[in-house]
């Protein structure tokens, strides 16, 4: 039986990119859910015109937007089998979604991460602070949890039932690392697949600003050390 797949895209002022993202998503997806995270541009209009379901979340934060999308799904009569998370800036290649969900469909993995560290990334697409942050976080996860993750990339797929069991809570920059740490902690089956990555449209709201970079770094380290301490008891 064909699995039901829904995509959640948090978006803040991505009017120039969001339409491209939605239109490039493969037709194996049942529904594309864009969470307009307080945008002041035409993100909502562009997303609706491209055929997405658009929700509005006034509280700023990547986690807030993701949780809004999950709350919407929780209230649907028919729940999906797989949830895919994807950024709205067109840095990921939405066409790679078929590659990301395949290990869940064919090999019964619970979680699949699209890794940007496999040499498929466009030159300059990942900023130095992103590269260093990824390296540090994945090294720490390997040290504390024997993890094989190589990236914290936002392009990922997860079984809906698995996602519910994770009981996600981070509201801002720590959403991605929280998910990966809980996958490790609860011993779900996971794998990575290489994905392409290009220079985004517009300026990054996280790594493109000093404030965003600092707060993201603090969040990531906080989650890692929080779970490393828990693992000792």
Located regions from the model:
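Hydrophobic helical membrane-anchoring modules
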Residues: 1-4, 16, 146, 168-233
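Short loop->beta transition adjacent to catalytic acidic/histidine clusters or analogous donor-positioning motifs
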Residues: 2-5, 24-33, 53, 81
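Short, well-formed alpha-helical segments that are part of the catalytic scaffolds
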Residues: 12-27
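Donor nucleotide-sugar binding loop of glycosyltransferases
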Residues: 14-17, 39, 93
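A conserved acidic beta->alpha catalytic loop
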Residues: 36-45
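Acidic donor-diphosphate engagement hotspot in glycosyltransferases and nucleotidyltransferases
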Residues: 43, 95-99, 179
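Acceptor/aglycone-binding surface of glycosyltransferases and processive sugar-polymer synthases
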Residues: 58-60, 64-72, 94-173, 200-211, ...
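Short beta-strand-to-loop acidic/aromatic patch adjacent to the donor-nucleotide binding site
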Residues: 77-91
């Amino acid at each position: 039986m064909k699995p039901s797949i829904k995509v959640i895209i948090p978006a803040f002022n991505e009017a120039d990119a969001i339409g491209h993202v939605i239109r490039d998503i493969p037709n194996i997806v049942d529904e594309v859910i864009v969470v307009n995270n307080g945008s002041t541009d035409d993100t909502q209009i562009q997303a609706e015109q491209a055929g997405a379901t658009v929700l509005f979340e006034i509280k700023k934060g990547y986690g807030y937007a993701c949780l809004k999308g999950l709350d919407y799904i929780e209230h649907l009569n028919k729940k999906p089998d797989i949830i895919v998370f994807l950024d709205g800036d067109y840095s990921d290649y939405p066409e790679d979604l078929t590659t990301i969900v395949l290990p869940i469909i064919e090999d019964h993995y619970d979680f699949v991460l699209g890794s940007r560290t496999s040499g498929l990334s466009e030159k300059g697409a990942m900023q130095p602070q992103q590269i260093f942050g990824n390296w540090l976080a994945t090294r720490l996860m390997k040290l504390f949890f024997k993890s094989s993750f190589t990236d914290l990339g936002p392009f990922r797929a997860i079984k809906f039932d698995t996602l519910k069991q994770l009981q996600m809570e981070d509201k801002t920059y720590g959403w991605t690392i929280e998910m990966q740490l809980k996958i490790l902690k609860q011993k779900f089956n996971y794998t990575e697949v290489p994905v392409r990555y290009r220079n985004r449209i517009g300026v990054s709201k996280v790594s493109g600003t000093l404030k965003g970079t600092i707060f993201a770094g603090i969040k990531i380290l906080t989650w890692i050390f929080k779970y490393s301490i828990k693992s000792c008891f």
